[in-house]
Amino acid sequence: MDALSMTALADAQLNAARGARVGRAAHTVYGGQDCALRQTLLALAEGQRLDEHENPGEATLFVLDGRVQLGTSTGPVEGGTGDFIVIPEERHHLVALEDSVVLLTVVAKG
């Protein structure tokens, strides 16, 4: 197994997000439908959001670059470069307060 440069991947995905009509891009770093553990690098251009959705299992966000706000029924949580956020097991959304890249880690239920 080769090492993966998260910095290079983050740069590439952020460039893709900036050029995308929806203002976001994603790349599965590890896992997939057949794995309980999934890690996805998400890039969002400033002002873009992931609409409210259910938490698919235990989940965390690591902010690789930028600043994001995780919105939940218990209130918003802001995170900047280097911050680690545990996503509560409830409906939530994510907003990029500036161009941002996060690593989403999920362990699926069941």
Model-derived regions: residue spans:
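A short, N-terminal "cap"/entry segment at the start of jelly-roll beta-barrel domains
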Residues: M1-A36, G71
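Conserved short histidine dyad/triad with adjacent acidic residue
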Residues: G23, R38-N55, T81, E89
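Short beta-strand His + acidic residue motifs that chelate non-heme Fe in jelly-roll/DSBH
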Residues: L50-E52, L70-G71, H92-L97
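Glycine- and acidic-residue-biased ligand/ion/polar-headgroup-sensing regions
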Residues: G57-S73
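A cytosolic small-molecule/anion-sensing beta-strand core signal
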Residues: L64-D65, G80-T81, E98
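Short acidic-glycine-tyrosine-enriched beta hairpin
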Residues: S73-E90
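Ligand-binding loop in jelly-roll beta-barrel domains
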Residues: E89-G110
